[in-house]
Amino acid sequence: MAKTLYEKLFDAHVVYEAQNETPLLYIDRHLVHEVTSPQAFDGLRAHGRQVRQPGKTFATMDHNVSTQTKDINASGEMARIQMQELIKNCKEFGVELYDLNHPYQGIVHVMGPEQGVTLPGMTIVCGDSHTATHGAFGALAFGIGTSEVEHVLATQTLKQGRAKTMKIDVQGKAAPGITAKDIVLAIIGKTGSAGGTGHVVEFCGEAIRDLSMEGRMTLCNMAIEMGAKAGLVAPDETTFNYVRGRLHAPKGKDFDDAVAYWKTLKTDDGATFDTVVTLQAAEIAPQVTWGTNPGQVISVTDNIPDPASFSDPVERASAEKALAYMGLKSGIPLTDVAIDKVFIGSCTNSRIEDLRAAAEIAKGRKVAPGVQALVVPGSGPVKAQAEAEGLDKIFIEAGFEWRLPGCSMCLAMNNDRLNPGERCASTSNRNFEGRQGRGGRTHLVSPAMAAAAAVTGHFADIRNLK
């Protein structure tokens, strides 16, 4: 029987499935950070349990960390406690921790792939909703809650029901300058922010195959923003070349044997999906969100939509509420909207290719008066590579702030946040009310588009920048 990639991954990890019961899955990798793990470790301690597979569990600090100093006290009392608890718990339970002083420290979904912790064919979980990022490797990766974190720590297994399947086919080639971020925002614009609910999404088509691994990670990172459980891209030579030689990747003959298996991880001819969505890559322009969910998105050349143009009454009401919160008037060109802050970073867009794209726009230009622009590399290795390439100097010379790795302004859990009413062009993944700070107004864009907003002071079409 022909199977989808998701069905192959799921079935390969079923440990036990009783009749009319939820299947029990084996978990290959468990990624841990400081926010969703303290209660889970406390639960182990309370019941006298150990971490079942400490060698398959990897921890880092990212959500709460300061991006201006490596001082654990810099982000406030709650953050300090969470980070100290992680240090204590990892030491007690034998889990490898990339703490603030470790060269590999960074955002969990950047650190995993770059260290070869993430490999094709795996099941990967983390107490974080953007765990879908790792699906770019052809791994079944999804976020879990703190009680599930405890269960995986204790058993290396998790009960999971089967999801429905969705194929998103992005046909043809994308135009020059169109990035994975533009593609995924255009997809969510078409499906809506709940269009993938109950599904695992597989991204297919020529435009997807053309993406680098970093682009594919951006794509899968935002699968959750269309309501999907996880996102997948089938592994290919691009995947194998990225993984080869990384710290935790197989070596020598083991790697060759792994690749032989990984090549079987693709949807069979004749396999059927519950839902199929098709887009033409050539029609995708640079994207900018205008509202308070990622599905409220338009091309940079468009005008802010009129709520009356939405036939669905729920969408119309949502648009009215979003425009009021965002302080926008329908009908005005998006390029007339001025910004106060720019954030280039997050688990969506803080890898080396993202920073190169932003630096290309920033080079020889200056951040517009009155705009604060932050560039936050996703990890220690990304920061080191960017500095070796001189990208930090380009940003600093242009007036951007060059920061230490961390989740930063993606979410208001550290010192990097918006003040009420401030408008931000952000490369992150969520534009919900208050996501970047109470009363903050978030517009999601690609790294190049964020840099363009920084130097012009408003949203600008990168295709027209001279």
UniProtKB/Swiss-Prot annotation:
Keyword Metal-binding part of the UniProt annotation: yes
Cofactor: [4Fe-4S] cluster
Superkingdom of origin: Bacteria
Descriptive protein name: 3-isopropylmalate dehydratase large subunit
Pathway membership: Amino-acid biosynthesis; L-leucine biosynthesis; L-leucine from 3-methyl-2-oxobutanoate: step 2/4
Cofactor note as given: Binds 1 [4Fe-4S] cluster per subunit.
Amino-acid biosynthesis is among the record's keywords: yes
Functional description taken from the UniProt entry: Catalyzes the isomerization between 2-isopropylmalate and 3-isopropylmalate, via the formation of 2-isopropylmaleate.
Pfam families associated with the record: Aconitase (PF00330)
Signal peptide as annotated in the record: none
Binding-site list for [4Fe-4S] cluster: C347, C407, C410
Gene Ontology MF: a single term: 3-isopropylmalate dehydratase activity
Keywords per UniProt: 4Fe-4S, Amino-acid biosynthesis, Branched-chain amino acid biosynthesis, Iron, Iron-sulfur, Leucine biosynthesis, Lyase, Metal-binding
EC number(s) per entry: 4.2.1.33
GO biological process: L-leucine biosynthetic process
Subunit structure: Heterodimer of LeuC and LeuD.
Catalytic reaction annotation: (2R,3S)-3-isopropylmalate = (2S)-2-isopropylmalate
